[in-house]
Structure formats: C-alpha cells, structure tokens
A protein has these predicted regions:
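Short secondary-structure transition/capping segments
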Residues: 68-71, 94-97
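Conserved phosphate-binding/catalytic loop of the ribokinase/pfkB sugar-kinase fold
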Residues: 85-87, 97-123
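Short, flexible active-site loop motifs that bind/organize anionic cofactors or intermediates
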Residues: 56, 94, 113
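Glycine-rich phosphate/adenosyl-contacting loop at the front of the ribokinase-like
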Residues: 1-60, 65-69, 75
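General structural feature for long, well-ordered alpha-helical segments within catalytic domains
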Residues: 66, 70, 119-122
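A glycine-rich helix N-cap at a beta->alpha junction
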Residues: 73-89
Length: 123
C-alpha cells in the first residue's frame, strides 16, 4: 500500500456554543464548551487514516497538552508521526470557534502556534 503524505496544521479547537455570536464589546452566556482536534491538514490526515489509508502527517506542534492530544489521536489511528516536530519553545496552535447553535454560523480566530514556524529546513 502506498503512503498518503499530508502537510498541514494541527490546532486544538476550542468551541464556544451559544444562542448567538457576540457582537463587538458584547458578553453573552454560552451553553457548551468543547475542546477537540482541528486544523484543515490534520482533519484531512485523520479522514484518510479512518479510511484505512497509510498516512504520514507533516507538521509542527508544541510540547504541551494540545500537542499530546494530537499525538495520542494520531497514534490511536495508526498514523506515522515521524514527520511531526515537537517544538519545546512554541505552543501548539489553537482555534477559538464561536458557534451560533441556532444557525450553525461561526466565527473563528486561529493562532497557528508551532505550526506557523515550520520552515523548509524542517521539511
């Protein structure tokens, strides 16, 4: 079987669910908070692994709890993590996602963290 290599970003998704997305300067009460894996490249690699693909994911994460979440998930799916760099000086990226539970609309703020420092030399 051939290997599927995916180059991309892992971020920890911090989802905040409420009846609306707050407007500028507004504070609202939410109904739910969910933390889970995210990042477009990571999501593609996970999908390929769940379809029994042999996957190699290329990214950079921090040496922290969010990076640990990524590695635990990838290992559980049997993905090759040899191309994942853990940077002890950078944190793993995060995405703050506000979701309107009535409409499904969202607003997202992404901090790429370690993945934003990936260079050609790293690859």
């Amino acid at each position: 079987m051939k290997t599927i290599s995916v180059f991309g970003v892992f971020v920890a998704d911090l989802c905040f669910i409420a009846n609306a997305i707050p407007e500028k300067g507004q504070t609202i009460l939410g109904s739910q908070h969910i933390v889970g894996p995210g990042g477009k490249g990571s999501n593609q690699a996970i999908a390929a692994a769940k379809l029994n693909g042999r996957v190699n994911f290329i990214t950079k994460i921090g040496n922290d709890k969010n990076g640990e979440m990524a590695l635990n998930l990838y290992n559980a799916l049997g993905m090759n993590t040899d191309s994942i760099i853990q940077d002890k000086n950078q944190s793993t990226g995060v995405a703050g996602i506000m979701v309107n539970e009535k409409t499904g609309d969202n607003a997202i703020n992404i901090i790429p963290g370690a993945a934003g420092t990936l260079t050609n030399d790293d690859i």
